[in-house]
C-alpha cells in the first residue's frame, strides 16, 4: 500500500520535525520552510494534504492557501492551517482563503490525525 504524501509548511524547523515524527510512520512527509516553497512543492508533488502555518516568510499561509485553491493543479488538495493564532476572526479568514481545517498550536497527535482523516480520501 502506498503511503499518502503530506506537505508540512512551517518556517519553524522544530514544528516540521515534531509533525514529521507524529506522522512519518503513516505518511510520506514533504517539508517547506516558507509559503513560496510550499506553493512550488504543492504543484510539483501534489500531496494528499497540506499542513500550513499562517505566519511564514515570503508568502504567508493565507496567501499560499488562496493561490493553492486558485490553481487548477492544486485546488482539490485539502489545506489545514496549523497556527498559534487561535482567534475566531483568523479562523474565518483562513476559511475564506480556502482552508479546509484549522488547528491551534500546541496540538496533540490525536487532534492532528482526526482532522487529517476527516479530510483525506482513503489511501
Give residue ranges: language-model regions.
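Two-component/phosphorelay signaling modules centered on CheY-like receiver
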Residues: 13-30
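Active-site beta3 strand of CheY-like receiver
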Residues: 45-51
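C-terminal output helix
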Residues: 107-116
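Short hydrophobic/Thr-rich beta-strand motif most characteristic of the beta2 strand and flanking loop
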Residues: 27-33, 41, 103
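Receiver (REC) domain active-site loop signature in two-component systems and cognate sites
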Residues: 56
Amino acid at each position: 500500500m502506498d503511503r499518502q504524501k503530506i506537505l508540512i509548511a512551517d518556517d519553524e524547523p522544530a514544528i516540521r520535525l515534531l509533525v514529521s515524527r507524529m506522522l512519518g510512520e503513516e505518511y510520506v512527509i514533504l517539508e517547506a520552510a516558507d509559503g513560496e516553497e510550499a506553493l512550488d512543492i504543492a504543484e510539483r508533488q501534489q500531496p494528499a494534504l497540506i499542513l500550513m502555518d499562517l505566519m511564514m516568510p515570503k508568502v504567508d499561509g493565507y496567501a499560499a492557501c488562496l493561490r493553492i485553491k486558485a490553481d487548477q493543479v492544486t485546488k482539490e488538495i485539502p489545506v489545514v492551517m496549523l497556527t498559534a493564532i487561535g482567534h475566531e476572526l483568523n479562523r474565518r479568514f483562513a476559511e475564506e482563503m480556502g482552508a479546509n481545517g484549522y488547528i491551534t498550536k500546541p496540538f496533540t497527535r490525536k487532534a492532528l490525525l482526526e482532522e487529517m482523516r476527516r479530510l483525506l480520501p482513503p489511501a
